[in-house]
Amino acid sequence: MADESERLNKPISTAELERRWQAVRKSMEAQSIDVLVMQNNNDFMGGYVKYFTDLPATNGYALSVIFPRDEGMTVIGQGPFGADRMLPPEGDGVRRGVRRVMSSPSYSAAPYTKENDAALAEKALEAYSGATIGLVGTGALPSAFVDYLRRGKLSNAKFTDASDLVDDIKAIKSAEELDFIRATAIMQDRCMDAAFKAMAPGKKDIEVAAIAEHTGHSFGSEQGLFMCASGPVGTAPLQANRHFQNRTIRQGDQLSLLVESNGAGGFYTELGRTCVLGKASQEMKDEFAFVIEARNFTLKLLKPGASGKDIWETYNEFMRKNGRPEEKRLYCHGQGYDMVERPLVRFDEPMKLKANMVVSCHPTYALAGSFNWACDDYLITDRGCERLHQFPEIITELG
């Protein structure tokens, strides 16, 4: 392989990419799938493309990957008409394992371009007109893209959903992936600390969140979600995105901040805490203590072999027993290249937990006088859960 470009932000090793390709191709062979097709258009929940290529999809621009069982990949992205380039076996220093690069100037905001990328994919798949084609991430593949492939020159091919095939491999983290994830968690500890230190009367919520984001950028973070909300102690301000972060902070206010960003290399974790410009109320302290109790109750359930359904039902029974609201949100889920990835702790998740999965756990509920939560990431092991963040498990009082 050619040396990676010096412009790349913390690339994964080629050995790790080859491990993934080998594992996926072994499963493809076992399931008689000849080629995989996937597409993402963002690096919040666009992890499939990143997993195979180490290149993020960004800005709403579609990035499609065709992954054959027996040869290099084809990558289709935004660019000039007619671009169709074959790469040498060693790659070009950026695209590893990629045989062919194609492009078109297509955009989701211009619907008449909806078949441009599909036409290129059809061209790249011409050798698979009678093959079995696995679609990966069917929740992200545009219907126009798939419909074009099904009705055109590939109409005799068999199409199957191969998302589970990839998810079963992608959800279990390698040693190298865990090194990246640990670094993301420590970065977020620093983001939270910097944001809380910048908290002051007269600042807007968005300014405090921006401190967390900027701190992450200084450690190589490329993307993230920074939700927050301030309000007087004795109320329950619900954290929200930037459009709702215009409130001016006052002395005595509380602020809840979620730092859900990727680190250098693209892996996500998330950290959530509350701080107060003054003193927390007794209700806030009591409910935070219960949140930690509920979180610890969940952690004991996060064992290899456990099911999302059983955890969901057992946790809600615990909440009812203790007079707290049942959880109807997604309060515990996997993370990796996707901000939210499988397994999900829900009543309908078929994937069982396994060792070396990384999950975020964030019990959350609002009462009339308090917004109650905590959020950290954990590594599931055969010996229990290891907390990856190191930020104190407290409500931070700033004066």
What kind of region is each of these model predictions?
Residues 1-399:
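Active-site neighborhoods and metal-handling regions in enzymes and metal-associated proteins
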